[in-house]
Amino acid sequence: STKPEVFERGIILTSSSGRSAPALAEHALMFMLSLTYDLPMLMRAQKEHKWAVSREYSEKTGMYRKTVGVIGLGMTGSEVARLVKSFDMKVLAWDRRRKEAQNVDQVYGAENGDNLNELLAQCDYVVLSLELNDQTFHIIDAAQLAAMKKTAFLVNMGRGGLVNEPAMIEALKHG
């Protein structure tokens, strides 16, 4: 939040809230596709002129009709929800205030008494698109990581503090 000294000194503040939402949402989609199809492996194979795909790659099922959890329904999260609908994905969302939203199949929220872990347990993808504050710091912690499917992908489009990094490392090593 803005410090009183800013106003006392007559400094003009402007905001471009939402201006980058389309690009950030596209970025999230790029990460989702890259993770789904193991883009680094495909790029290495192409560089090495290996045209036969591995059995593991050929068994990948894509994003079509999978479930995505959008955590934070601001402008970026809402745009992510809109874009993933082109893959006929089921969109679950977590937002502290919202009761319903366009392009979202079901909205969960703390003010409604919902449990974030219930949403996470259903998701093949989780996209974090919320601001970092006292309520969202480590919103993804050991309990949330444990609630997620072992095959789920986590895409953090917000600040690093949204995820408890040591808990994530532990979950990746032993989960």
Residue ranges of predicted features:
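An N-terminal-biased, well-structured beta-alpha scaffold segment characteristic
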Residues: 1-13, 141
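A short helix->loop->beta-strand "cap" motif at the edges of active sites that frequently abuts
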Residues: 8-12, 88-89, 150-152, 174-175
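Phosphate-binding beta-alpha-beta segment of Rossmann-like dinucleotide-binding domains, i.e.
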Residues: 11-67
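Glycine-rich Rossmann-fold phosphate-binding loop(s) that bind the pyrophosphate
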Residues: 73-74
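N-terminal Rossmann-fold NAD(P) dinucleotide-binding loop
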Residues: 77-78
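Gly/Ala-rich phosphate-binding loop of Rossmann-like dinucleotide-binding domains
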Residues: 81, 85, 172
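Short beta-strand "acidic-cap" motif of Rossmann-like dinucleotide-binding folds
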Residues: 91-93
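Rossmann-like adenosine-cofactor binding region
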Residues: 98-175
